[in-house]
């Protein structure tokens, strides 16, 4: 019985850690790097925070598609263009990048630190 408990604990730890790791093939960039990309025309800037968070404060040029709606609204994005994802801390945008990757998107970039690191 003790072995089963340890196996369960180890599996839970692995799943938890895996949830926080960036998806393979997703670029991680700083807020400094994204400031240069905001001016480019061939990128899609997506803020995955809630509509209320976005309404209270957002970066010009970013479109709001909340994480909870990314699967339903992914058709609004062009798979051929780079998708740059932003949230408050980088956690939700990381999850969004994993969801979009599963949906076949390959040009994905996550903003490390999100809005919290924006200056």
Where are the model-predicted features located?
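Conserved beta-strand scaffold positions in the cores of enzyme catalytic domains, especially
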Residues: 28, 45, 62-64, 108-110
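Conserved functional loop/turn residues at catalytic and ligand-binding sites
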Residues: 42, 58, 66, 90-91, ...
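Catalytic cysteine-centered active loop of the rhodanese-like fold, especially the PTP/DSP P-loop
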Residues: 71, 77-119
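Flexible, polar/low-complexity N-terminal or interdomain linker segments that lie immediately upstream
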Residues: 1-44, 48-55
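Extracytoplasmic/periplasmic/luminal assembly and interaction segments
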Residues: 52-86
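Small-side-chain structural scaffolding
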Residues: 34, 43, 48, 62, ...
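Residues at the C-termini of beta-strands that transition into short coil/loop
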Residues: 32, 49, 66-68, 112
């Amino acid at each position: 019985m003790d072995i089963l408990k340890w196996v369960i604990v180890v599996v839970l730890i692995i799943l938890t850690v895996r949830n926080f790791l960036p998806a393979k093939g997703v670029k991680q960039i700083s807020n400094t790097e994204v400031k240069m990309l905001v001016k480019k025309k061939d990128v899609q800037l997506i803020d995955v925070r809630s509509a209320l968070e976005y309404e209270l404060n957002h970066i010009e040029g970013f479109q709001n598609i909340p994480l909870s709606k990314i699967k339903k609204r992914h058709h609004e994005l062009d798979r051929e263009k780079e998708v740059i994802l932003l949230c408050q801390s980088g956690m939700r945008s990381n999850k969004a990048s994993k969801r979009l990757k599963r949906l076949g998107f390959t040009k994905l970039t996550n903003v490390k630190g999100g809005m919290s690191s924006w200056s």
